[in-house]
Amino acid sequence: MSNQEVELVIIGSGPAGYTAAVYAARAGLAPVVLAGSVTAGGALMTTTEVENFPGFVDGVQGPELMESMRAQAERFGASILLDDAVLVDLDGPVKTVETGSGETFHARAVILTMGSAYRKLGIADEERLTGRGVSWCATCDGFFFREQEIVVVGGGDSAMEEALFLTRFASKVTVVHRRGEFRASKIMAQRVLDHPKIEVVWNSEVAGLIGAEKVEAVSLRNTVTGAERKLPVTGVFVAIGHDPRSEIVTGLVDTDADGYVLVEHPSTRTNLAGVFAAGDLVDHTYRQAITAAGTGCAAAQDAQHYLAALDEAAPALTATEEVFA
């Protein structure tokens, strides 16, 4: 356990956190990145092929992209810790961040990049059957469903990606979507519709999970007629969106009704001086790796300008001496 005085703490990783770390480190701020004990790298750590990140003609694996970003940030002097922020005090000129391992950081500025978490179905037995047929990660669990029939729930690009990846293992993939058309990009949707191992069930939702020790079937409910039917499957992969990981700052910074952190657009400033936010913690519209990286860059520059303004206001002392005096 220790107490450390630093210029900048970045809570979270992913494209936003790592990009913020690159820019902050290059600016000489020596940022400390609390990347997460389990979630380091963010959602892209469970993403297979990333085809729309500029600079990769043939695409890039999500974990590979995140590892490159992490290494780049460390190269410029960022300290990246596989630890979680568990308690924060963001008021006043000095922010305090306590970690799960017992470390305490006192920083002049904080950037929030905790991202978002997989949204759950919210139905009976979902928790009980998690890991027993219910999953949110095709790349993690797809192998276990070789030559089995499975369901993918969702209609966005993530659901399309999951379904296509799972055709490598499953004998049949049924995509269940509550509407009559996909929200996914045309190219991803068409790949799913054209795939011989994928069937789409429109205007339907998973109303129930069936199975004592593991998933044996799902109950599908038609969202138009209300009729229900049983579909025998052994796996259910959920890809219905995300919820922001803002619990640790709820009540401290302003958020919207869904928990997304509010910023003073076009900047990344929150309602608290010296606290900035970026990535999917803020953005529920675009939610792309490249947009997260862009806001991470912006947050680092906003933090840099904020700290520079503090230094100009107190020229007699060094920045650290001034706030920690």
Predicted features, each with a name:
Residues E5-E7, D83, R146-Q148, N203, ...:
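Phosphate-coordination loops involved in phosphoryl transfer and adenosine-cofactor binding
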Residues G12, T113-M114, K120-G122, V153, ...:
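Short, well-ordered coil/turn residues at beta-beta hairpins
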Residues I80-R146:
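Glycine/small-residue-rich loop that forms an oxyanion/phosphate-binding "nest" at active or ligand-binding sites
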Residues R70-T99, T104-A107, T167-H265, H305-A325:
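A Rossmann-like FAD-binding core segment of flavoenzymes
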Residues V22, M160-E162, L272, A278-A325:
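A conserved FAD-binding loop/helix module that cradles the flavin
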Residues E5, G122, E127-F144, I240-Q288, ...:
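FAD-site-proximal beta/loop scaffold in flavoenzymes
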Residues G14-P15, T39, S116-Y118, D157-S158, ...:
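Residue-level detector of alpha-helix initiation sites
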Residues V6-F76, Q148-E149, M160-K186, D256, ...:
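Beta1-alpha1 glycine-rich phosphate/pyrophosphate-binding loop at the start
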